Amino acid sequence: MEKHLENFKLIAEIGWNHMGNIDLAAKMIKEAKNSGCNYAKFQNWSVKNLKSGPWDHDGRREIYEKAELDKNKTEQIYKICQEVGINFLTSIFNSKEIEYVSKI
């Protein structure tokens, strides 16, 4: 059974739980690595590109703004992943994020 385990990859779904805080993201990345995960997964979106919805009036848009990963933060997180020795992975919500994420 153990020889088949090498075919599996464990992904830590960090998402946006870091709330835009790079220090917190770094702690989560290290915990993911220490837990045996192969990937630390995040989410990239631009609040200005979100469609209008109930989140515009219930406080969620402000939360999304706080948790948004711009190019600089994404690059920092990517570098932390490299330093820790875990693969970086992200879900991208629109084509503008594809442009800069694909370049890191």
Where are these regions (language model features)?
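N-terminal amphipathic alpha-helix/helix-capping segment at the start of soluble metabolic enzymes
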Residues: M1-G15
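Hydrophobic faces of well-ordered beta-strands that scaffold small-molecule active sites
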Residues: L10-I14, A40-F42, F88-S91
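Conserved, mostly hydrophobic/aromatic
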Residues: E13, A32, V101
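Active-site beta-loop-alpha junctions enriched in small/polar residues
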Residues: G15-N17, Q43-V47, F93-S95
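Glycine-rich anion/phosphate-binding loops
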Residues: N17-E31, K71-N72
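Catalytic domains of carbohydrate-active enzymes, especially glycoside hydrolases
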Residues: A26-W45, I104
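Glycine-rich, proline-tolerant flexible connector loops at the mouths of alpha/beta enzymes
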Residues: N38-L69
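Active-site beta->alpha loop and helix N-cap motifs at the rims of alpha/beta catalytic domains
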Residues: D58-I104
